[in-house]
Amino acid sequence: MGNASENFDIEDLMSYGDDLINLLNVKNGFDIISQSSEQFKALNFACHEDFNQIQGSIEDCKTKLYACKKKTEEAYSDIAAEDEIERLQKELDEEMEREFKLKDELRLVADELKDLNAQLSSIDEHKQSTKRKVRDDLRAEKKLSMYASVTNVIPDIDDPSKISGYMVDREKRLIEKFQFETNKMTAYETCNSIWSIINKQ
């Protein structure tokens, strides 16, 4: 079996050698070999050019792929940033709405406080007015008491359009009412009439 393989190789080698001799014996055989060599060199050069071009294309693709990857990462980063901005904007809107509601509540409380202060001021004024009225009434009462003790006359000051009052006789325990129409009497006549009533006591 080994001999058959060796014989086969030798036969192939001898056949290749015969073909080569025949090729060299041809008139233009050397030219064909030279032409084939030139074609081989040209093909080899073209292959190198194609290789270099493909290699450059691969590097260019790598560069573009890196740039695309970087842009993708930036895009994801921008998306994340946009999500964060949207979240912060939402929180800001919620805080602004909460602040607006608090301002409304504060305004209502301020209005209520203003009303309470106005009521308190009115109460204080009414209290002071009541105190003045009580004081004035007490003063008037004392004045009337003094008039009554001196003149035995208690004037009626509730109606300023007329002069009226009561004549008091403490000994007899009598009270007599008197009244003068100011539109029918002069001030002088009214004064004389009052003194006449007093002198009767």
Swiss-Prot record:
Domain of life: Eukaryota
Effect of a null allele: Embryonic lethality due to division arrest before the globular stage.
Alphabetized InterPro entries for the sequence: SPC24-like
Cell division among keywords: yes
GO BP annotation list: cell division; meristem structural organization; positive regulation of cell division; regulation of chromosome segregation
Principal subcellular localisation of the protein: nucleus
Role of this protein: Acts as a component of the essential kinetochore-associated NDC80 complex, which is required for chromosome segregation and spindle checkpoint activity to ensure proper cell division. Required for the maintenance of plant architecture.
Name of the protein described by the UniProt record: Kinetochore protein SPC24 homolog
Organism (species): Arabidopsis thaliana
